[in-house]
């Protein structure tokens, strides 16, 4: 019987992101900081840790030191770059690879890898803004929008989140839903406060928070003649059943519109046998 020493065979370290090496592992979200374990076969080994994601590659940056992940012994922490999401404009998750180059002193031992999968956080979504204008010029005249007269021009702008394109628009205005970036409403149908809101949805299917704006809409009704009487009279307006003049008395109501509305009254008359009316302005 006897004994003999066995030669140490250096084998590259097998990295893991969570527990099991050599499998793609769901590590959380882009922007999260994860632990990468070297699982080294010798305490003499050091490592350089690299990443590959889509067409991007490079040396990982240690989240604790801010330096490149070289001379790593047992493990380190890495923040998955949020910029990776720019390569995922139409999906909400993506996979990459962690490569670990193992060294024994200055001697290169080999490279092994593990995969990882990260998701786009729910907080990553587009944003929306809106511009709302009076499309009729009514607001400039009366200081407010006016029911039955004003129309709104609404322009919705969507801002991409990590290069995910804006795919659709949803605008709610005047009780109607629109699906275009620029719209003009029909005439406003309700008085009081009207609110315009809009959202955008991107290529990942993420919908923005609503952008909204509220406006006061003045009530408006068409002018109404509430009283009208006609009598024969003299030139001075005194009653005379045989007079050669006609005295017209009337009352009418118009909507104030911030005391900026005015009225012009017209009287039309004709002989019974005539076809056309004659119109005069009344004061």
Regions found by a protein language model. Give the residues of each.
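Hydrophobic/tyrosine-rich beta-strand signature of extracellular beta-sandwich/beta-rich modules
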Residues: 98-100, 198
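Surface-exposed, short loops/turns at beta-strand junctions within beta-sandwich domains
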Residues: 80-97, 108, 184-194, 283
């Amino acid at each position: 019987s006897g004994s003999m020493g066995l030669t140490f065979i250096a084998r590259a370290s097998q990295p893991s992101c969570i527990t099991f090496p050599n499998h793609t592992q769901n590590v959380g979200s882009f922007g999260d900081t994860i632990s990468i374990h070297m699982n080294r076969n010798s305490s003499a080994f050091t490592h350089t840790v690299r990443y590959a994601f889509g067409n991007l590659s490079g040396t990982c940056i240690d989240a604790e030191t801010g330096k490149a992940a070289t001379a790593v012994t047992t493990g380190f922490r890495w923040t998955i770059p949020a910029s990776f999401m720019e390569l995922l404009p139409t999906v909400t998750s993506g996979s990459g690879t962690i490569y670990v180059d193992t060294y024994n002193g200055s001697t290169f031992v080999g490279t092994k890898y593990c995969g990882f999968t990260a998701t786009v956080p729910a907080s990553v979504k587009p944003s929306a803004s809106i511009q709302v204008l009076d499309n009729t010029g009514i607001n400039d005249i009366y200081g407010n929008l006016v029911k039955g007269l004003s129309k709104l021009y609404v322009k919705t702008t969507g801002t991409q989140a990590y290069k995910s394109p804006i795919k659709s628009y949803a605008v709610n205005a005047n009780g109607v839903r629109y699906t275009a970036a620029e719209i003009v409403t029909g005439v406003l149908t309700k008085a009081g406060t009207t609110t315009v809101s809009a959202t955008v949805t991107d290529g990942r299917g993420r919908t923005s928070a609503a952008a909204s704006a509220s406006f006061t809409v003045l009530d408006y009704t068409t002018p109404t003649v509430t009283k009208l009487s006609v009598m024969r009279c003299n030139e001075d307006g005194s009653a005379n059943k045989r007079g050669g003049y006609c005295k017209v008395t009337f009352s009418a109501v118009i909507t104030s519109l911030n005391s900026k509305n005015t009225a012009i009254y017209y009287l039309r008359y004709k002989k019974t046998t005539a076809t056309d009316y004659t119109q005069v302005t009344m004061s």
